[in-house]
Amino acid sequence: MIIIKKIKWIDKEAQEAEVLLSDNNYCILCFSSPCTLSENSVFEDIIYGFNVENIFKLSQEEYAVEKDDKSYNHKLKGKFVDDRNSILQIGEFRIDLSDGEIPKDIIAGDFIEVSVSRIEIY
């Protein structure tokens, strides 16, 4: 189960916020606009990666979420579970990577690494 751990308002009037999600194994910082979420509630939706690049297949099973301290950039490692909809799974998180061009040799079931400039909640 993914929980909304923290909401940090960027602009409350514009409903723009940084949202920290956790499944107790991984934490992902997302941008949300409009943000209508509440702290400590369950989050069941998919999240979206933007400016998806540096996509490549891993030689072994690996899961990781690495955030750049100075930006919203993330390096993600996980299982590519849906090649039709470009979905990456890390723990309980399902991340839509359709903003990027997935190489044709990557298929569902492969483990991949990818960089995104931002992760969003709609």
Pin down the residues of each PLM region.
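Structural detector for short beta-strands of small beta-barrel domains
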Residues: M1-K12, A64-R84, V114
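OB-fold/S1-family single-stranded nucleic acid-binding modules
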Residues: G49-N73, S117-Y122
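Generic structural motif
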Residues: I7-K12, N24-Y26, F50-V52, K79, ...
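Acidic (E/D-rich), amphipathic helical modules within compact regulatory domains
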Residues: Q15-L58
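Flexible glycine-rich surface loops and low-complexity tracts that mediate binding to linear polymers
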Residues: N40-E53, G78, A108-Y122
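Short aromatic-glycine-enriched beta-strand elements
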Residues: Q15-V19, R84-Q89
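Short amphipathic alpha-helical surface micro-motifs
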Residues: M1-I3, I10-K12, N25-I28, K57-E61, ...
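Beta-strand/loop nucleic-acid-binding surfaces
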Residues: D23-L37, I90-A108, S115-V116, E120
